[in-house]
Amino acid sequence: MRPETKQSKNERVIAVFGGSAPTEGSTGYEEARLVGRLLAQAGFTVMNGGYMGTMEAVSRGAKEAGGHTLGITNAAPFWRDLQPNPWIDREEKASDLLSRLRRLTLADGFLVLKGSVGTLTELALTWSLMQTQAIPRVPFVLLGSHWQRVLDVFVTNSYARPPDLAMIQVADTPEEAVELLTQGGKGR
């Protein structure tokens, strides 16, 4: 993450991408909440899109564990009526969706949860920016075996080379995901 956007030079920020649909009590929400708690306990600041669903859940988990949160919201007209979730400490308003996506790629690591088209966009953009060295190669973890099927499409169709695939790790549990991020992406 750029030094000028950090609260302190020691702040380690993990961008968490995931769906906006999960609601409190659902499996997706509660898993994201656990992820937030574990990230905060590991000393990370949690950054996300700042709104509802897994963004709210991961922020809530981090705050419940005494951690810090950063929400990158959108000032564009389509988004203007949305309020950031109540678990966000710091809000940064991007002028449009592309600026928001770019800002979300400025992190010390990435964790991708279950989501929809927006999550897939964030995953692909981050992966491409790392692959082209537009952003530094940092830990990049996908949570859940369903992501392996997505990656397999790239392998089967020769869309991604082995070095490209080596940038991404798939974790089976929130604990494993946070451990991989803590280890700097080194693991299995």
Where does each model-flagged region fall?
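Conserved phosphate- and dinucleotide-binding cores of soluble alpha/beta proteins
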Residues: 94-167
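Short, charged/polar "capping" segments at the starts of alpha-helices
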Residues: 24, 78-81, 147-152
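Glycine-rich beta-alpha loop segments
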Residues: 1-70
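Acidic/glycine-enriched connector segments
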Residues: 30, 53-114
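Short glycine-rich anion-binding loops that position phosphate/pyrophosphate groups of nucleotides
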Residues: 19-22, 75-77, 115-119
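A charged, well-structured terminal subsegment
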Residues: 107-109, 162-188
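Short internal beta-strands
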Residues: 45-49, 70-75, 138-145
